[in-house]
Amino acid sequence: MTAQPPFGQAPLPAHLALRIALAARSLKGVDTAHLLRALIAAVGEPITEARLRKLRASRLRTRLLETCGEGVQSTLTDRQLHSALGLLKGRGVRMPEDPLPIPEPYRNGEFQDSVRIACASDNGERLDGIFSNCTRFLIYQISPRESRLIDLREPGPCREDEDRHARRAELLADCQLLYTLSIGGPAAAKVVRAGVHPVRLARARPAREIVEELQRVLATAPPPWLAKAMGAEPDQRIRFTQ
């Protein structure tokens, strides 16, 4: 069933309709129509990406029980609920028209005065992921004059005895910056310990926009810590701060 609002209301964007349909499939005893009604009750209308991003599991559970009745309570597990919530927020959902970008070869030292950044991503070449559970990291090498996507790094599943945050931080140890939609305190500490500076964004954006913005900063007045990461001499770093 296609996830669309009742007759007379504006249709959902295709990417949100897909998320809702996939989330409904992950909830035992809940169909797409019931989930859609529960979401409208939980976040209001129109259903938007920003509103879904703020949705909490407890509120979703309450609205599902109100919409579907007490019968669903015995079949609705925490695991199902958190899986559905992740899908609603776009984690691991990739639209067919969002092909993965293709990295280009890069030799270390090829770009002078450059930094390497990681962007948490779930879809195509978008910065739309959360550090702790994004599908992959887009790795860019950026100088004031050039930029290049040099790698796609997928953390993959962790063993039960592994620290997933430390494992992800180690994956980015050759980067200077991490861009993500969200990162918790303990995870951020592990990222910083790996020598990477985390940057949290308020909303999903095309990764290339971030690259272009950072290029402008590098070309004008990077802060001292970033100038150091670029390999600038101390006297140059002083000039950057003036």
Swiss-Prot record:
Gene: nifY
PANTHER family named in the record: IRON-MOLIBDENUM COFACTOR PROCESSING PROTEIN (PTHR33937:SF1), IRON-MOLYBDENUM PROTEIN-RELATED-RELATED (PTHR33937)
Protein name as catalogued: Protein NifY
Domain of life where this protein originates: Bacteria
Keyword tags: Nitrogen fixation
Cross-referenced Pfam families: DIMCO_N, Nitro_FeMo-Co
CDD domains: NifX
GO biological process terms held by the UniProt record: nitrogen fixation
Assigned protein family: Belongs to the NifX/NifY family.
